[in-house]
Amino acid sequence: MDFEIQELNSDVLGKKLGQKLFSPKGSLLLGMGAEIKEFHYQKIKEVGYQSIYVLKDDYSDVLKSSGHLISEKLRASAPLELKGIYRKLMSKDKISISNGKKELSSMADTLIREVNIKMTNPPDIIDLKRQEDYLYQHAINVAAYSILIAQSVQYHQLKLFDVTLAALLCDFGMHYVDEEILYKPEPLDEKEIEEMRKHTILGFQYLGRNCFIKGLIAVVCLQHHERYDGSGYPKHMSGDDIHEYSRIVSIADFFDAYTSDRPYRRLHSIEEGIEYLKEPSGREFDPRIVRHFLSFFE
């Protein structure tokens, strides 16, 4: 790689930024390749980034790269838009829920159009996620990776649309998890882990009962942490008993989470994520779908 991940501290001063940084409202804070000065450092810190990408000495190829699955503009604006959609879906007002569903469908259409399956560079959508926006930024990335996989396995347009909606909603139930657990800066204890895991059931139940979301889409909320070898949750399902949509989204969800910076653990590189899926530990996932996903990094 032509960039490296560095914890946000004074050591980044004078280095070149390895990715565009945006404010919570989507405005550009600092462009890729810009030298990080004291003013920039303080602003980035104020916005809430915990680590950043810095370019290595020879960074000209990175600046010319076009391997992003989705545009910088959409990556900046979509999380805030999705946050608004979630709020509408959580409303008890039928009109707000209906509007939220329409906006969600529009977002799914936009993401599908943006993902370029014929790219010559490996897909690159790792983002520097602000803690308070992590859920929404993660959902956008999961959707983009899921689209990539779904296109690779030759999904027709309707199935592609469904799996995109499912990916955008897979962590909807996180809204019903205590924020102290959700944003805890250290590893969770066993009781907290059990509470966190309830998001699968809570999301499935709410979307089905209150939003009348299509059954197969809501099922992904329930199943996206199930594992092919039976080691997942909440029902310890295995193999083809797990719906294929869920098997696709589970890989996308894992890969983005694994390559994201979290308060309680360091960010892993794309290479480390790939190696995890290749090793025996990767047996948690459908091997056929894993092969489709990894083919984009070869």
What positions do the PLM features span?
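Terminal helices and disordered tails flanking the catalytic cores of nucleotide-processing hydrolases
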Residues: M1-A108, P122, R266-E298
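Alpha-helical scaffolding flanking metal-ion-dependent phosphate/phosphodiester catalytic sites
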Residues: L165-V177, L188, I193-Q205, R209-V290
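Acidic/His-rich, divalent-metal-binding segments that scaffold phosphate/diphosphate chemistry
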Residues: S60-R197, F204-C211, G215-L216
